[in-house]
Amino acid sequence: MTYNQPNNKGFYGQFGGQFVPETLMTAVKQLEEAYVDSKKDPLFQAELKELLKDYVGRENPLYYAKRLTEYAGGAKIYLKREDLNHTGAHKINNALGQVLLAKKMGKNKVIAETGAGQHGVASATAAALFGMECTIYMGEEDVKRQSLNVFRMELLGAKVHSVTDGSRVLKDAVNAALRAWVAQVEDTHYVMGSVLGPHPFPQIVRDYQAVIGQEARAQFLEKENKLPDALVACVGGGSNSMGLFYPFVNDESVAMYGVEAAGLGIDTPHHAATITKGRPGVLHGTLMDVLQDENGQMLEAFSISAGLDYPGIGPEHSYFNAVGRAKYVDITDEEALEGFKILSRTEGIIPALESSHAIAYAVKLAKELGADKSMIVCLSGRGDKDVVQVKERLEAEKEVKK
Amino acid sequence: MKTLQMTLSNKKNNFIPYIMAGDHEKGLEGLKETIQLLEQAGSSAIEIGVPFSDPVADGPVIEQAGLRALARNVSLSSILETLKTIDTKVPLVIMTYFNPVYQFGIEKFVAALEKTPVKGLIIPDLPKEHEDYIKPFINDKDICLVPLVSLTTPLSRQKELVADAEGFIYAVAINGVTGKENAYSNQLDQHLKALSSLTDVPVLTGFGISTLSDVDRFNKVSSGVIVGSKIVRDLHEGKENEVIKFIENAINF
């Protein structure tokens, strides 16, 4: 049966929905209408396609990582090179689409949340391109951890609002952005950065990121004349993974692996393994798996990678997990760091710490699958933003050893 | 007609204070005396807030109160246990985000409410589209699910929201979070009057109300007011007398 989610109420099985205050209902309904219209509007689609080609630099390569494959000693590993996009990650695919939508709706201001800063940079970039006013909400902790991205956003003309509520990370930035949206909903669009939030956001972000899987599928067919056996991508909120997975959803022979951040380990309190350790709950407008205590209070997520540091996961991922369409696995901080180093050394590609989780799992999976199999790994972003953090960590480890 | 609506329909200048359960130096032990104080001052009903880690509809005053309550290990389940022991003539209204209720179990929640003086529910992140999570369980009980109507709600939707409303209609007076002051639009009074004319269910106005002149203004164009952040702040600062005086003045306009 052809996959056909979400339903007309914005649910993926039991997950999804629109759990937002009444003040936002008109805005999410307006967004839904504008989005449906835009899909039928050839001019809109042509403008987006042209931007993706000439501005983002798509299509980006599907690269056969020969030396990484040899290192892993098993299945062939192909990398979908989202790291080569303008701004260095997959986030721009969605930011451009949503800023175009905002323009279509006559909204001249955009706001967005950001964790590591990649979605903030992508949104600020898209806003600069269209001359729109842009405010980015970022947890105070992340502002400190990612000061270079803060400077980038400011260079691009955005205002960065440091969020001092709660644990001062991504979850709190989303709270602040939602509150700001309520206060200026009539002239402002909220550029949701992942497949999260009230319907239609999870669908819109999935569809704008689906270009990843559409290209990768066609490229793989051309190179190998068959479909891959597996797809691997990291999952925080889950936008790069859903972008890769979704175009393969009806290809039953293709297995999907979403790699969650296990932080210090899933048996410690310090992880972001939402599917493994969470259960269904409502946060930020949607029903999805979340990390929460027995009373339904959200727990803090933890990961070396700021982009995976979120206690929820997109509702469609919860659905994929519930029906068994995708498998969700965990990679610790240590393993991710190893992946970061391995890809740098074997292929000369420095991956983002987020994507390093996918690399680390791909190496394990390649061995399990064996040499006659193949997989596509989403290399969702480049690692320049993480180099300083990794350097400090490795130096600290050396100190301890001395 | 359910108790909550009957109580509010019978008078003008209704005053509903909001308090955060467990935000008291004695924790939930202090809830009873706060309810008594608000009842004696002349409240029509009392809104009891359930703390939540991510209260996106609330401003900083209520968010902080919630964090203080959570730090005292207050939970929906301990609040329900406490409410069972409280005897009050004014109807209580629980204000909670949806997730604590969803985790507790909706049927179990409604069953527990029946042993308390709670007569209404306000769930700001459960819009009309999702009321079926709760409504079927309370239809034949003396509990109302109070709808919120915002300034961004178009007229056609306002009509849908009030059509089967019970208890009262919560008119959100600003586009913003609770406790945001001095932001009322000039068209607000007209909006409230028009909204009230759509229904026989009492319309009460809330969000950002902190002065007696606000109260006077909204009593003229609706059936009363809901005051949260001001009450929560005053109680936290130990200004019980100020709260009593404010309520007494508010209901005597």
From Swiss-Prot, chain A:
Pathway: Amino-acid biosynthesis; L-tryptophan biosynthesis; L-tryptophan from chorismate: step 5/5. The modification N6-(pyridoxal phosphate)lysine is found at K91. InterPro entries: Trp_synth_b_CS, Trp_synth_beta, Trp_synth_beta/beta-like, TrpB-like_PALP, TrpB-like_PALP_sf. Pfam families: PALP (PF00291). Disulfide bonds: none annotated. It catalyses: (1S,2R)-1-C-(indol-3-yl)glycerol 3-phosphate + L-serine = D-glyceraldehyde 3-phosphate + L-tryptophan + H2O. Its cofactor is pyridoxal 5'-phosphate. Its EC number is 4.2.1.20. GO terms for molecular function: tryptophan synthase activity. Keywords: Amino-acid biosynthesis, Aromatic amino acid biosynthesis, Lyase, Pyridoxal phosphate, Tryptophan biosynthesis. One of its GO terms (cellular component) is cytoplasm. It comes from the Bacteria. PROSITE patterns: TRP_SYNTHASE_BETA. NCBIfam families: trpB (TIGR00263). Belongs to the TrpB family. Tetramer of two alpha and two beta chains. The beta subunit is responsible for the synthesis of L-tryptophan from indole and L-serine. This is Tryptophan synthase beta chain. It comes from Lactococcus lactis subsp. lactis (strain IL1403).
UniProtKB/Swiss-Prot annotation, chain B:
Keywords: Amino-acid biosynthesis, Aromatic amino acid biosynthesis, Lyase, Tryptophan biosynthesis. GO terms for cellular component: cytosol. Pathway: Amino-acid biosynthesis; L-tryptophan biosynthesis; L-tryptophan from chorismate: step 5/5. It is an enzyme of class 4 (lyase). The active site is at E47 (proton acceptor), D58 (proton acceptor). It catalyses: (1S,2R)-1-C-(indol-3-yl)glycerol 3-phosphate + L-serine = D-glyceraldehyde 3-phosphate + L-tryptophan + H2O. Signal peptide: none annotated. Its EC number is 4.2.1.20. InterPro entries: Aldolase_TIM, RibuloseP-bd_barrel, Trp_synthase_alpha_AS, Trp_synthase_suA. The keyword ATP-binding does not apply. The keyword Lyase applies. Tetramer of two alpha and two beta chains. HAMAP family: Trp_synth_alpha. NCBIfam families: trpA (TIGR00262). The alpha subunit is responsible for the aldol cleavage of indoleglycerol phosphate to indole and glyceraldehyde 3-phosphate. PANTHER family: TRYPTOPHAN SYNTHASE ALPHA CHAIN, CHLOROPLASTIC, TRYPTOPHAN SYNTHASE, ALPHA CHAIN. Belongs to the TrpA family. This is Tryptophan synthase alpha chain. The gene is trpA.
